[in-house]
Design a protein with these regions (language model features):
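Charged phosphate-binding loop/patch that engages nucleotide di/tri-phosphates or the phosphate backbone
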Residues: 166-192
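Hydrophobic (often cysteine-bearing) scaffold residues that line and stabilize catalytic clefts
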Residues: 35, 75, 79, 164, ...
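Local beta-strand/beta-hairpin segments that build beta-sheet-rich folds
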Residues: 2, 101-102
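Unchanged
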Residues: 73-97, 105-161, 190-192
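Short active-site-proximal "capping" loops at secondary-structure junctions
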Residues: 57-59, 103-106
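Short connector loops at helix/strand junctions that flank enzyme active sites
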Residues: 36, 63, 68, 116-120, ...
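Tryptophan-centric aromatic hotspots in well-structured domains and transmembrane helices
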Residues: 35, 66, 103, 148-151
């Protein structure tokens, strides 16, 4: 993941829906002045398991959480391009069918000695490639991630560990039961 942090801050409840976007960088509400533009991937395998990364605060490995692959946009790339690039860098998975934007959230959180303010878009993606091995982690990512894991919806719902966005288990269950929303769901902002 380039651009240092991947957006480890929490996300919370549904605030409503907004217009659809193809992830090409077009508007989906206000971008938020000064917010880092981030693309994240809700990657599902043929068994509908979701791939999550395990991260932690570099100076405090006991402060850990699970989160979706993704990171900041580079140059003039679109959110969809960033999603695919970040997924390849962080998981080694390149055989992917990228789908629609499912959710969007604004978050602000402390990580590695600074505050991160992010505007995150979550893309649905499918793959049959289940072996995941990071190929191009930044120095910060190497100091703050410990691996990847495929989770079933039931495992995620029963997890006692911290997972971001905080409603991911509920959001995944809804996605699997109802399919992608007609327009991206805007999650309530969360400041940690």
């Amino acid at each position: 993941m380039t651009g240092e942090a991947g957006g480890f801050g929490p996300g919370a409840g549904e605030a409503g829906r907004t217009s659809a976007s193809d992830g090409s960088g077009g508007a989906l509400g206000d971008e938020g002045s000064g917010f880092r533009k981030v693309a994240r991937v809700v990657l599902l395998d043929p068994q509908d398991r979701i791939l999550l990364m395990h991260g932690y605060e570099p100076d405090n490995p006991d402060d850990s959480w699970w989160f979706t692959p993704g990171g900041g946009l580079e140059g003039d790339e679109t959110r969809a391009e960033a999603a695919l690039r970040e997924l390849a860098e962080e998981t080694g998975i390149t055989d992917v069918q990228l789908g629609p934007v499912l959710w969007r959230r604004m978050c602000s959180f402390p990580f590695d000695g600074r505050r991160w303010d992010q505007d995150e878009w979550y893309f649905l993606a499918r793959t049959t490639q289940t072996e995941a091995v990071p190929t191009d982690l930044t120095e910060l990512e190497r100091r703050s991630t410990t691996g990847l894991r495929w989770w079933t919806s039931a495992e995620l719902s029963a997890a006692r560990e911290t997972v971001y966005p905080t409603r991911l288990a509920e959001l995944l269950r809804t996605l699997l039961d109802e399919g992608p929303p007609r327009a991206p769901v805007v999650l309530a902002p969360e400041i940690v």
